[in-house]
């Protein structure tokens, strides 16, 4: 059995027939499976015990040898080895084919590898393989050409004419002969020569052939191995046959497919022995070829083989493919032991780090622990009796359970887990009933509510797992959201309402104007009903200052840590969030958790005290509504008249009418807000941020306003009524459009957003923080992101938590904002520094960025900046790629789906929302493309024959003309100076054009700004660095233009680092370096272009990826997370990273030897770069010793 942690990479290749025979435990000769009477496997059949091992532990087929003492004996009667039955999962068999057959993957894939090697078209190849045409193998002295196809009649004529002077054949045998003859070295030389001489289509073909030839040459695979003489038979336990209740059998489709192969093979053997006529043998060979094709990839060629009920049988390829395939179903998503699930209810009395676990569930989950403790404490004599005690639920079991779960965290998860906060650890508290209780403040992270949501519980078993759960996953340690560094655990709903009510002040309340000597006296007065909760009073603080406040605020400030000062204002949701963030920044985790629990207790208590509820009388309709509507009607009528007289166009009328109604709606809303009392229940709920918003109040008490029709165009007939008055039939009908569209959108959005997240995770899963400093001198310049006049992302947001690359000085006062020392020490900018830079009016700052990071696999600490989830420095081993993918994908469901239709305006609609994000990350040509200037210069706009043209005059006087398509809006003005890459018309820029004009730096800035724009317009904040990680992955590859003296192939995609390395080698040997141009890959393409074939195969296009990998003999270095999960190793991130795992304790006072260094640093980390500077110095010293 292979030991999991002693290999660093895994390789895939073609299997030669000898290799398959070597692996095999025996030949399967008969198509039989099991005997219908004895239900025992048939000898030499597909389930044969002699080949695959015994069906029952330590027992041979005939029963002569039973029991473990005969271990390893081979029975002399039935030939079965006595061993564990589990070997039936591991032992392969094989089928010796009577005629060679081609492997469909290599013949049918795109491009056809066999076709490329033989320089034949796949169509010609198919004719030969399926016995339609002959192929000339040896022309001899005939006028025929090698590899020429002959029909049956032509072949006969030539046979009669030339006799045995030439050789031709059909089927896989003929192709095999041709493949054996290939000399790879020579072919590669010829093709390289051809590359220099030809161009166009022929050059492309030559490059593709050379790729395949090089692949075979480098990998040590032989071309003839693409033709199979032997078919391996996978172990029987992986294609089981089980008896159903009714005595019938259910079997895997593979058994059917294998049976067809064996039947046809045996028939072919018999025909060959009998010396049957050629035509019959040929037909049988063709059928054998088709049977093997169906076994490997059913349905790839011709009609798929179907089982009962016309269902296509699942072949070996289907076993790997898709969501239900081996990769995604069993290797990347396993079911786990020690887990349970139940409905969740709120636990308002829990502390931040606790959850309520139902007693019976806890007993089941912790059963082994409880049993062990029962034995240890002497309640039971052995494990068996302890198990009985637990099953009978004796009273002492509960006491033991209490002990066991103390300090043993459990993990709670809610599907869909959109980001890492979807699974957190808690300390369990036993509760009665059958529902899990969770803390109300973690609901935001889980996106949970209590309308019947369920959650799963998992138990971390080992001590390490428990420690990690407690230190890294405990809810109290996950207060900040990794996507923007803002608190995710902050008060909501009732808690907000209670705090808001508590901190409000009311004029003329009982006890207003009273003055107290300290807070205690004020509280005493309140307890004795001398002063009300919201009356304005004056209190002297400890430091002697007098403060006008209310009793409510005094109570509220009791839970606020003193360091934060006295909070003397009305606390709505935003203020509370700020308080939490402030507390976290200044006082850290533990204090914040306490603060949250304090606010929770107060909030619930006082929202109950307030007795805030909602009733029909709370909704008061403003008096002014009638008047406002009447005025609007009048204006609309005027416009209608103008339209009928032909003074304005339909378009103008539409726009004006919509303007009027929007205006009227706003006025009604303003009037409504003015009439509501600030202690009105509905008003308080909305303004505190507990539930609802002004728009919803407007619909209840003002007017519903304008609605959109199904296409998204706004209907110019408003709904004048509100829900308090009730809608007319027509109004009701109009509003159904919006309601239905909302629901349909939500459903679509969830699926699209999930798929986007999956692609993002796949492209960035191997980005891990791997070193302290990559030593780059490059960086990016950041400035505020603006959209026309409004700012989308302010400069300070982009700077905070990043490492600066230049000294920043205040332009007016000359004050140093960022010192040289800070730049040299790579310290991140604080919030205060970032704000100071923005306030100083500085436009742009150069910072370190993931985009320009030079770390080979992953990123370095300084380029990444601070860890948003903790606010501290990022650790080596943090899987920042996954965090970035989750941060971008998780808010995806909040983005809109719609393409905005500007009511009937000409010109393409610009895509927005989720589709726009997808368009950017996939680097697609956008809908409604803008024209981009290819050079700097000044603008002239002309009209030629009714078409508009933009002429750019360069500085050297050259002119360039761009035709403007009909209906496009021009963005530039006459005489304006522009730079290359600027947009000339409205619309979205094609990123590939931008890459050509402005190079990678231009595209990076553009993509970053565009993605931010979409999210910010929806009110979602995401930190730049997450988007930068994705952009970096999209720009990892370059396309080779000229190979120079390197081994590289023109037209190939290659990693920038590999490219630089190859060039360095070439230059060192005095050769010409290769020339390449940067390419922008969409995330799907980038995922498939990764070094790891396991990761690519488990993502999409499984068969294609594996075919290519096998031919190239690819090696997977297992650097990413997915590859390691697939083969069952610990992921190389976090505590699973080799530098954290290979810890060897050396005795004190012993010298540190060279071999210790080898033990301490595995192969891959022996690189110096992995060490921090101090470590390097230590190392050099020890080596000198």
From Swiss-Prot:
Role description: DNA-dependent RNA polymerase catalyzes the transcription of DNA into RNA using the four ribonucleoside triphosphates as substrates.
Give yes or no: UniProt keyword Hydrolase.
Answer: no
- In Swiss-Prot or TrEMBL terms, this protein is called DNA-directed RNA polymerase subunit beta'
Any binding details for the cofactor?
A: Binds 1 Mg(2+) ion per subunit. Binds 2 Zn(2+) ions per subunit.
Which UniProt keyword terms apply here? DNA-directed RNA polymerase, Magnesium, Metal-binding, Nucleotidyltransferase, Transcription, Transferase, Zinc
| Residues reported in the UniProt entry to bind Mg(2+) | 449, 451, 453
Chain residues that bind Zn(2+) 2: 774, 853, 860, 863
Q: What is its EC number?
A: 2.7.7.6
Q: GO CC terms on record?
A: DNA-directed RNA polymerase complex
Q: Which cofactor does it need?
A: Mg(2+); Zn(2+)
Gene3D superfamilies recorded: 1.10.132.30, 1.10.150.390, 1.10.1790.20, 1.10.40.90, 2.40.40.20, 2.40.50.100, RNA polymerase II, clamp domain, RNA polymerase Rpb1, domain 3
Assembly mode: The RNAP catalytic core consists of 2 alpha, 1 beta, 1 beta' and 1 omega subunit. When a sigma factor is associated with the core the holoenzyme is formed, which can initiate transcription.
Q: Name one GO molecular function term.
A: magnesium ion binding
Q: Which InterPro entries match?
A: DNA-dir_RpoC_beta_prime (IPR045867), DNA-dir_RpoC_beta_prime_bact (IPR012754), RNA_pol_asu (IPR000722), RNA_pol_N (IPR006592), RNA_pol_Rpb1_1 (IPR007080), RNA_pol_Rpb1_3 (IPR007066), RNA_pol_Rpb1_3_sf (IPR042102), RNA_pol_Rpb1_4 (IPR007083)
Keyword flag rRNA-binding: no
Organism in which the protein naturally occurs: Desulforamulus reducens (strain ATCC BAA-1160 / DSM 100696 / MI-1)
Instruction: Write out the residues that bind Zn(2+) 1.
Output: 60, 62, 75, 78
Family matches, as SMART domains: RPOLA_N (SM00663)
To which protein family does this belong? Belongs to the RNA polymerase beta' chain family.
Q: Which reaction(s) does the protein catalyse, per the Swiss-Prot or TrEMBL entry? A: RNA(n) + a ribonucleoside 5'-triphosphate = RNA(n+1) + diphosphate
Q: Which GO terms describe its biological process?
A: DNA-templated transcription
Which NCBIfam families does this UniProt record tie to the protein? PRK14906.1, rpoC_TIGR
């Amino acid at each position: 059995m292979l030991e999991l942690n002693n290999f660093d990479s895994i390789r895939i290749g073609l299997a030669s027939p000898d290799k398959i025979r070597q692996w095999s435990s025996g030949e399967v000769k008969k198509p039989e499976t099991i005997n219908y009477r004895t239900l025992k496997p048939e000898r030499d059949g597909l389930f044969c015990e002699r080949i695959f091992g015994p069906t029952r532990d330590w027992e041979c087929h005939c029963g002569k040898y039973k029991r473990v003492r005969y271990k390893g004996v081979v029975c002399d009667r039935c030939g079965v080895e006595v061993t564990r039955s589990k070997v039936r999962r591991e032992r392969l068999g094989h089928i010796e084919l009577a005629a060679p057959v081609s492997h469909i993957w290599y013949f049918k894939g795109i491009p056809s590898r066999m076709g490329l090697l033989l320089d034949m078209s796949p169509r010609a190849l198919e004719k030969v393989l399926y016995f339609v045409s002959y192929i000339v193998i040896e022309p001899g002295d005939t006028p025929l050409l090698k590899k020429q196809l002959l029909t049956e009649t032509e072949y006969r004529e030539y046979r009669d004419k030339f006799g045995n002077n030439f050789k031709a054949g059909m089927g896989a045998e003929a192709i095999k002969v041709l493949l054996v003859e290939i000399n790879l070295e020579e072919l590669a030389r010829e093709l390289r020569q051809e590359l220099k001489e030809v161009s166009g289509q022929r050059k492309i073909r030559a490059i593709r052939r050379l790729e395949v030839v090089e692949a075979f040459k480098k990998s040590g695979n032989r071309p003839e191995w693409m033709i199979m003489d032997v078919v391996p038979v996978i172990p029987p336990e992986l294609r089981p046959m089980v008896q159903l209740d009714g005595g019938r059998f259910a079997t895997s489709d593979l058994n059917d497919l294998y049976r067809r192969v064996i039947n046809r093979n045996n028939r072919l053997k018999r025909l060959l022995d009998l010396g049957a006529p050629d035509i019959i043998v040929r037909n049988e060979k063709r059928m054998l070829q088709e049977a093997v094709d169906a076994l490997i990839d059913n349905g790839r060629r011709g009609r798929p083989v179907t089982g009962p009920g016309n269902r296509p049988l699942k072949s070996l390829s289907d076993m790997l493919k898709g969501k239900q395939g081996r990769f995604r179903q069993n290797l990347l998503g396993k079911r786990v032991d020690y887990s349970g699930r139940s409905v969740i209810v709120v636990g308002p009395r829990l502390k931040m780090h606790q959850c309520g676990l139902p007693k019976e569930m806890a007993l089941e989950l912790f059963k082994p622990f409880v049993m062990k403790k029962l034995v240890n404490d002497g309640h039971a004599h052995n494990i068996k009796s302890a198990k009985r005690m637990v099953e009978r639920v004796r009273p002492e079991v509960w006491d033991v359970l209490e002990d066991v779960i103390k300090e043993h965290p459990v993990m709670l998860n809610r599907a869909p887990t959109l980001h890492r906060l979807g699974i957190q650890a808690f300390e369990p508290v036993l509760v009665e009933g059958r529902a899990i209780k969770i803390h109300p403040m973690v609901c935001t992270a889980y996106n949970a509510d209590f309308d019947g949501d369920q959650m799963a519980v998992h138990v971390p078993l080992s001590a390490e797992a428990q420690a990690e759960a407690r230190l890294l996953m405990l809810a109290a340690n996950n207060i900040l959201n990794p996507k923007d560094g803002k608190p995710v655990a902050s008060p909501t709903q009732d808690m907000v309402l209670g705090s808001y009510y508590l901190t409000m002040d009311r004029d003329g309340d009982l006890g207003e104007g009273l003055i107290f000597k300290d807070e205690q006296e004020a509280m005493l007065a309140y307890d004795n009903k001398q002063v009300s909760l919201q009356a304005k009073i004056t209190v002297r603080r400890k430091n002697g200052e007098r403060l006008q406040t209310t009793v409510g605020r005094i109570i509220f400030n009791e839970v606020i840590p003193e360091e934060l000062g006295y909070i003397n204002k009305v606390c709505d949701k935003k203020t509370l969030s700020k308080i939490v963030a402030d507390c976290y920044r200044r006082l850290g985790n533990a204090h914040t958790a306490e603060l949250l629990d304090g606010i929770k207790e107060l909030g619930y208590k006082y929202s109950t005290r307030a007795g805030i509820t909602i009733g029909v009388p709370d909704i008061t309709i403003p008096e002014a509504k009638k008047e406002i509507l009447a005025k609007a009607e009048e204006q609309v009528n005027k416009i209608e008249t103008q339209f009928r007289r032909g003074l304005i166009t339909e378009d103008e009328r539409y726009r004006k009418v919509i303007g009027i109604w929007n205006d009227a709606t706003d006025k009604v809303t303003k009037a409504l807000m003015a009439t509501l009392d600030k202690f009105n229940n509905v008003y308080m709920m909305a303004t505190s941020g507990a539930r609802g918003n002004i728009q919803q109040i407007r619909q209840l008490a003002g007017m519903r306003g304008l609605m959109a029709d199904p296409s998204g165009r706004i209907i110019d007939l408003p709904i004048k009524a509100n829900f308090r008055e009730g809608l007319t039939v027509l109004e009701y009908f109009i509003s159904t459009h919006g309601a239905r569209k909302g629901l349909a959108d939500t459903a679509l959005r969830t699926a699209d957003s999930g798929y986007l997240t999956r692609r993002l995770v796949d492209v960035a899963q191997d980005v891990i923080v791997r070193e302290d400093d990559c030593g780059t001198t490059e960086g990016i310049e950041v400035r505020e992101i603006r959209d026309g006049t409004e700012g989308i992302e302010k400069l300070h947001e982009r700077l905070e938590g990043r490492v600066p690359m230049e000294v920043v000085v205040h332009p007016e006062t000359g004050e140093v904002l960022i010192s040289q020392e800070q730049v040299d020490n790579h310290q991140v900018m604080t919030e205060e520094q970032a704000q100071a830079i923005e306030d100083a009016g500085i436009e742009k700052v150069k910072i370190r960025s993931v985009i320009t990071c030079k770390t080979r696999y992953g990123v370095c600490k300084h380029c990444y900046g601070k860890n948003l989830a903790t606010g501290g420095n990022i650790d080596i081993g943090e899987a920042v790629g996954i965090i970035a993918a989750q941060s971008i994908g998780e808010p995806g469901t909040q983005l809109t789906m719609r393409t905005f239709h500007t009511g009937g305006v000409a010109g393409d609609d610009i895509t927005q929302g989720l589709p726009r994000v997808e368009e950017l990350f996939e680097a697609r040509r956008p809908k409604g493309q803008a024209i981009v200037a290819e050079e700097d210069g000044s603008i002239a706009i002309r009209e030629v024959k009714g078409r508009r043209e933009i002429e750019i005059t360069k500085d050297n006087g050259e002119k360039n003309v761009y035709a403007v398509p009909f209906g496009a809006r021009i963005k530039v003005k006459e005489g304006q100076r522009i730079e290359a890459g600027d947009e000339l018309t409205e619309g979205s820029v094609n990123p590939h054009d931008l890459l050509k004009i402005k190079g990678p730096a231009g595209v990076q800035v553009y993509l970053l700004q565009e993605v931010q724009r979409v999210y910010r317009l929806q009110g979602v904040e995401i930190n730049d660095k997450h988007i930068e990680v994705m952009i970096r992955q999209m720009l990892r590859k370059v396309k080779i233009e000229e190979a120079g003296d390197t081994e590289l192939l023109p037209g190939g995609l290659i990693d920038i680092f590999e490219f630089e390395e190859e060039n360095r080698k070439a230059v060192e040997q005095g050769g010409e370096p290769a020339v390449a141009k940067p390419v922008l890959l969409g995330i799907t393409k980038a995922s498939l272009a990764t070094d790891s074939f396991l990761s690519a195969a488990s993502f999409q296009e499984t068969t294609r990826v594996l075919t290519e990998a096998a031919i190239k003999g690819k090696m997977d270095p297992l650097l990413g997370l997915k590859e390691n999960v697939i083969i069952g190793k610990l992921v190389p991130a976090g505590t699973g990273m080799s530098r954290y795992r290979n810890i060897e304790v050396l005795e004190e006072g012993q010298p540190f030897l060279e071999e210790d260094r080898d033990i301490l640093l595995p192969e891959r980390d022996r690189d110096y770069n992995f060490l921090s500077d101090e470590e390097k110095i230590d190392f050099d010293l020890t080596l000198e010793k």
